[in-house]
Amino acid sequence: MAGLVCFLALVSSSAFAANWPANTLDDLTDIKEAISENHPGPVDPENPKFVDWLNDGYEAAEKLAKKAKTKADYERVLRQYVNGFRDGHLLLYPAKPENLIWPGFLTRSDGEGKTTVSFTSPLSSFLEGSKLVGCDGTKTSDLLEQRVFNVRTNKDIPHEKIVDSPHLFLVAQNDQTKPKTCSFLVNGKLTDLYLDWSAIDPETAESNVRKASGNHRPELGIQKIDGVWFISLPTFNFWGERAVKIQNLITELGDKKEALHKAEFVVFDVRGNDGGNSGWGDQIVAKLWGARTARNLETSKDQTVDWRVSEYNEQALREQAIRSADAGLTDASKFRIRVADDMRKSRINGTDLMLDEARPTGPGLPLQTPSPFQGKVYLLTDWYCASACLDFADNMRNLADVVHIGQPTSADSVYIDNVWKDLPSGEMKFSWSLKVYRNRLCANNIWYDPVIRWTGGEMEDEAVAQWVKTLAN
């Protein structure tokens, strides 16, 4: 009986492995259909290249799907197709957390052709700072292009390569194409190293990538460092039970408002913030600058928006309305119900794109509210700032008393406001945008450059505090 069980297990494993081409093709086709039926891009008259990649990219990915042998191959095919749209809001993520493997070190590229070891385990510490020359006869630039940039980097945003480059040595457990032997310049001496890959859990992997990329993601909160107040907002992704964290912070801002208004230096710190719900940023502005200023900001921007009309999108909006209400975002909930109702009418009329006629569609009155802050106020960004973080940056940069400092932000396409679905294989989830901004302040895949750039080196709290105090001189 034991032998029969082993035999059945082998048959099952083999059959499952043989299904990777089918799984890849099924999910690839489902992604294409989801985009075709629900994303604004295929019916957007201002973006004909979107449809070109929808079809041409699919044909190329379809050929690769037939060759998939492992889950690593499966994921590469899907990511390469999705990444080709150059739309940061088209997203793939695992249906459940999965362990990855790494060789005990991660590298970072400087954007100018040099890749160095920037994070190591204790056993690999001798590699710290060494230059990666190549692996298995392939030079570093080609490795990065094949294994990282083609599958995760928006090539319209050059500095995104720096952020993504640490993923070169973080791979799926069954990746048969992972590097085996790599060459390094260690203290000026060429050294060949056989890579010893070991498991790493997702949370540790994410933490290591951030460290390797030089990203310092603060804890949510308010603190004073060496005379400088930091209002740290590492994410706006607060839903359900987690919403109480940002709600408590906003309450604390109200309690400390007088001290902040009188402070010599205040920094709104969005290092590591890659988005979430922009409503939280709006509430922060209203709490510290007042409801009138928040309203003026809202009406000062051209918010012409077209929504992609579909049954799936309508239902998703109604579900989001429930989640927003549960998080205490009453206005956001009402807004989504209103859009869903309008979408239903448009769907009945056979409309593909629906103009949101209730949104401001032209520049409103200029901001004339006096600043409540007596000292210097800064918005601190890094390369991660995207989505709702960019919405927050839109507002902060339009307040006369705020100076943008730090590193350039990331960038968004004009497509935004996401929903998601499970793919047929159950391996991945796919997320896409519901609407297209016509005249957004930060245009398609255009990032914000700070008024004052970070001087270089690790952007640690104490170093930032010292730097901020020099900016007033």
State where each predicted segment sits:
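Low-complexity, serine/threonine/proline-enriched polar segments
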Residues: T299-L353
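Bacterial N-terminal signal peptides that target proteins for export
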Residues: M1-L4
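Low-complexity, Gly/Ser/Thr/Pro-rich intrinsically disordered linker/tail segments
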Residues: N439-N473
